[in-house]
Amino acid sequence: MNYKVASAKNIATLLFLFSSQSQAFDLGKIAKIKAGAESFSKVGFNNKPINTNKGLYPTETFMTIMAYMQVDFAELLPKSATANGHHLDGSLGGWGGAVIYDTTKDFINEVTGKPYGAMAWNYVGYWGGLVGQKPWASCGLATGNLTQSQYDKMTQAQMTQLSNQEALEASTCAKTYADHTRNYVIYNAYLRYNYKDIFEIRGGRYESPADYMSGYNQGLDMTLNLGNFKFWWFSSFGRGFAYNEWLYNFYSPKTYTLKNGQTINPGVHAFYIIWNYKGWSIQPFVYFSPFNEYDPNFTITYDSNPTFTGLGFRSQTDVTVLNPFYAKRFWDTYQFGMPAGKNAHSLMIKQKFEWNEYNFGFGIYKSFGNANWMIGYHGNRLGFDFWTNTVYANTLNSLSYMMDANAFTVFAFGGGVHRKLLWGLLGRLTYGPRANEQVLSLNLGYKFTKNFSADIKFEYYNMLMHQGYKMGWNGPKLDSQPATDQDRSHIFTEIVWKL
């Protein structure tokens, strides 16, 4: 398989050729332009100074401004082809923006008496090259990078000293990323062919439909429908973000270094076999990244009213089990503050009810072993945002501790849509070996016009880090580290304008 995905330039050339080779094509008829501007802000309530030795970090406040333009080509084939069920469409779109306010630039580290450094690049502008080949990407963002056998040779005092030292090095590394941001991305650049409702193939850059690879995909996917069966293949050789909170140019989330030192992009791939019958859906599927992980999984869902359109009653049940197996080189390492191990499992059970314009439900999410550090955190079927921690958590990202090894989460939600107003409530309790979390959030959204809408979320978020564990350290337990209780409460706002 050719791992090199067509560039945006090649896609644009193809679109031009298709649209210009026949007089039957009228650009005004086949092309539709979309454009808009959006803004996102997060307001954190914990503004205490940083102390890297104690593992104490504030909750960031930042604001973005974004704009995009997209050209959609609805049909690129002549009527003689479409009459026989053949269709070809495509899209080309670009997104750009910037952080216009960022409190992380001013947070002081009490250990050094100096600013820790800007961290908003973690949301907007992160860039180290497709496979992390850029010079600044070789520094250590993560702490606790030794193996268990190496830690076994160290005393507790030595590990504590190492955790303090690496936290300062991570700060220096973060500053180099802040100096090399890339605040734009060609997020859409694809062609899609389908034949009736039987076969479809799409390649290029497009928003990922994969449950466990969110964002935008650089790769391809294929669908084959045969009666009650659906077969779906997905390949990703790059992941990007083009949203008002997140803006990343494409990077490979899974890489492998050859013996000669060259880093390659083996991609992330998935294959689903889906059987649908009278509301039931049984989905055995596998995700894998060569040299990294192999995950045989399954999902079973039941929908009592698949044609639900907002009137009447609907019940939806979702049971998903993930079973990641890791490459041998990871077995002795620490990931998300816990040993990776050979393999792990996770279980999600989610129940949702809808009655006219209202919805409510509940669920559980349980990890057995370190199940999420490869597959679970790049995307999930949970249906809510679990990236609302501080940007300093887990060594420089805002991932919730509900993704930790052996963590157990119970959650409940409810909401409704009333003409132009929508609202939602979410409560979550997480119990884990590293941290407990209590979350309660209220979301409100209003569509003022067909072109303008706004949303706001209020979230109470308390995080209790257990004794022996320190934020910013992903290595073994530190006996001298006391428990810490840190406030992660915040407000999200979103403003969206579409042309």
Label for each model-derived stretch:
Residues 364-447:
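C-terminal structural cap/anchor segments
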Residues 61-67, 182-187, 214-218, 225, ...:
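Residues that define the transmembrane beta-barrel architecture of outer-membrane proteins
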Residues 67-75, 189-193, 220-224, 270-277, ...:
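Residues on the lipid-exposed face of transmembrane beta-strands in outer-membrane beta-barrel proteins
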Residues 232-297, 303-386, 390, 456-493:
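Outer-membrane beta-barrel translocator/channel fold
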Residues 112-274, 283-290, 384-403:
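Surface-exposed coil loops of outer-membrane beta-barrel proteins
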